[in-house]
Amino acid sequence: VDQLVKVAPAIIEMGCFARVETNGGGFEQVNLLFGENPNRAVREWTKPFHEAGIQTHMLDRALNGLRMSPVPADVRKLFYKVKHAQGTDITRTFCGLNDVRNIIPSIGYAHEAGMISQCSLCITFSPIHTVEYYVNMARQLIEAGADEICIKDMAGIGRPVSLGKIVAGIKKIKNIPIQYHSHAGPGFNMASILEVCQAGCDYIDVGMEPLSWGTGHADLISVQAMLKDAGFKVPEINMEAYMKVRSMIQEFMDDFLGLYISPKNRLMNSLLIAPGLPGGMMGSLMADLETNLESINKYKAKRNLPFMTQDELLIKLFNEVAYVWPRVGYPPLVTPFSQYVKNLAMMNVMAMEKGKERWGMIADDIWDMILGKAGRLPGKLAPEIIEKAEREGRKFFDGNPQDNYPDQLDKYRKMMLEKQWDKGQDDEELFEYAMHPAQYEAYKSGKAKEDFLADVKKRREEKANATAPVEAENKTKVLTVDVNGQPYRVTVAYGAVDPATLNAAAGGTPAAQTVAPVGEGKDILSPLEGKFFLVKNAQETPKKVGDKVAKGEVICYVEAMKTYNAIRAEYDGTITAICVNSGDSVSEDDV
């Protein structure tokens, strides 16, 4: 919060911004993960802009609200009431499937709260995402009461001329304000900005040094110079204030933000045109890629196979995205569906590199997308996907997606009363808990701040030691090893380790102290690397030692690449040990 409050006056002093994006999904979750209250952050961040007459702007994921999974209608409605009270003027609502049924309720919620409803067209490039497709979608949203339209070119792969035609087509329906949002990575967006402006676009999203270009927006200075030359009336930039803001952003990055930003994020890459993945997720993709590459090369090392390079894996991933995307119905590649398609492609690549078949692991959230529970897919599913769903007894859904998620605010009111937690000004704490239950609990307990500080310390040490020889990590792991056809359970440790540590490794929780006799029981191994969780939300009851489970029943989750992957029992039986704590990292084949 202190950084936001510090930089706001200099942003205002620049004198060139009509609007500033102040909050939304990423913003609020980052605050919670940082161990701070996002409600305080939004109020203090929006205040100076309001006082200066600059409109404030937030992002809304429609059915998903501010998170990666669907949100009950009562929570969505409270969301708008809270954010307007905190100082947000405009809501940019998008549905990752371009299903207007998910967007239209937000128009009503925005108007009821006194906000401007800006509805988005998620731009992608495919045989079905034509100019006519987008103009027709805009018509439906305008007829439903949208105040503005956003051309959300989140991957920067919209073709400039087509984007100009979309804007011109919308303006023929109604002279409504249009805002263009794009990312620079594939290389189209400067031409796209010029085309949409010539067609009548009113607002352009821009970035600034040192966070422009690459996976971010085109730079403010470049866009202003280009539009001025083209004859448009654009505001001047106070360059003295610009340099203040630039300096402060670099200062914040040097503090700790830079530890979470890959230098590769600033690179332009035309290879992004084919897979169409958005710039907003490329940073996390590159981080995930390192873990995925490590897993693949561990497999290859055990079999004396040549190692794979990161570039080789990246190209395989991009090729697999191109294979997967049409087969799952061409969902626009925007949060969360860009992550779903990318994760599905990565799981396929990893499986095939390890001698397995495609589609072996599909997370529940991805199944919800495939089955229609998140909205109507733009395209048709491949027969192989339909056959897999039917084989596993999964049911397709064509009703209103919101009907799948009943109201929950009363439940969270009761939980807050039991915990003696204040619902907050304008019910903002109630909203935060209902929107982000697990993250909010971690914030309230102090665990989020503790974990964040530990992670920053670790990253700083890794950065400092980047050129130093790397020693084996002093960490114990429980593995199952096959010797001449006989499975053995072993504990592996590196360096000087206390024998007590070895004994403790087999049981990370008190419940794990009850272990099956030697020779009895069967291990459940993690099929991938990630973080172990017994539940994925507050509605689930965690399994415990002594619980009976049936084959195929979900017993836990491994969170990888922002997706919770359900781990199912491979046998009927009784849980005799839980070998790791919730939130602990696990490697592939860990017990």
What is each of the regions a protein language model found here?
Residues 9, 18-137, 156-160:
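Active-site beta->alpha loop and helix N-cap motifs at the rims of alpha/beta catalytic domains
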Residues 153, 199-216:
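Glycine-rich phosphate-binding active-site loops on the catalytic face of alpha/beta enzymes
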Residues 93, 149, 200, 223, ...:
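Conserved, mostly hydrophobic/aromatic
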